């Protein structure tokens, strides 16, 4: 069992409060995963220029997408988060090794992601154990300078890109440095030439919440992530065995 520092404890408390509030079904304050936040948005109907809604939606989307790749994460973003939006662990079912601690910084920025964001993630990791994996999850592309900053960092880091179109949201880029490779020597990525299960499948089409409402909510992120061609999804592979779900 590993001991977590203050950042993990802060997130744990946040999650506990959310679970308590969830029982009240007060959608103005109740959300702790992608589905509950989409329900919240369907009531609030925020403007597509609402950056807070954009950022929060992307954090929950990253949480959902990375869960398909064996990351168990909880959201702790907000005031005083130190640049960390999700915390948790990476563990592979039926594989006996100690779960790896993970912190994730999510950037829904439009445009390229430069080295400043990688350095900010490095700074955020300073209050966590040295074997904690830091992931920078983004909509935009990484510059060559950001990839160089990743490669020379002395902390285990990974860069991840997410594609969003409302029905299919998935990871299509995942790169890590030598420090991360030392932790996961048998882990690799592989392209798959088929789309993962539709993200829309996770939303219950009951009560007043319809699939049409769900898809329209992703307009908050679509203009930021639209590309000319749909990128090829990735899966994670451990010792030649695919460990990603729904792919």
Swiss-Prot record:
Gene3D superfamilies according to UniProt: 3.40.1350.10
Cellular compartment(s): Mitochondrion
Keyword field contains Protein biosynthesis: no
Domain of life: Eukaryota
Keywords: Mitochondrion
GO cellular component terms attached to this protein's record: mitochondrion
Main location: mitochondrion
MF (Gene Ontology): endonuclease activity; nucleic acid binding
Pfam families cross-referenced by the UniProt entry: RRG7
GO annotation, biological process: double-strand break repair
PANTHER family in UniProt: REQUIRED FOR RESPIRATORY GROWTH PROTEIN 7, MITOCHONDRIAL
Protein name in the entry: Uncharacterized protein C824.03c, mitochondrial
Organism listed in the record: Schizosaccharomyces pombe (strain 972 / ATCC 24843) (Fission yeast)
């Amino acid at each position: 069992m590993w001991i977590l520092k203050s950042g993990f404890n802060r997130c744990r408390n946040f999650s506990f409060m959310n679970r308590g509030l969830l029982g009240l079904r007060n959608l103005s304050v109740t959300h702790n995963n992608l589905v509950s936040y989409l329900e919240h948005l369907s009531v609030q109907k925020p403007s597509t220029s609402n950056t807070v809604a954009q950022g929060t939606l992307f954090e929950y989307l990253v949480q959902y997408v990375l869960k398909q790749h064996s990351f168990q994460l909880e959201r702790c973003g907000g005031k005083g988060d130190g640049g960390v939006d999700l915390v948790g662990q990476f563990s592979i079912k039926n594989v006996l090794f100690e779960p790896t601690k993970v912190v994730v910084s999510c950037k829904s920025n439009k445009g390229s992601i430069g080295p400043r964001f990688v350095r900010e993630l490095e700074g955020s990791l300073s209050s966590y154990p040295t074997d904690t994996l830091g992931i920078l999850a983004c909509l935009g592309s990484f510059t060559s300078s950001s990839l160089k900053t990743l490669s020379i960092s002395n902390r285990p880091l990974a860069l991840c890109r997410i594609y969003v179109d409302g029905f299919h949201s998935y990871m299509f880029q995942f790169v890590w440095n030598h420090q991360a490779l030392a932790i996961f020597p048998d882990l690799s990525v592989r392209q798959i030439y088929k789309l993962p299960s539709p993200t829309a499948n996770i939303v219950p089409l009951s009560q007043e919440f319809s699939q049409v409402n769900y898809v329209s909510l992703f307009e908050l992120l679509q203009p930021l992530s639209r590309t000319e061609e749909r990128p090829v999804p990735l899966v994670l592979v451990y010792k030649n065995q695919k460990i990603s779900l729904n792919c």
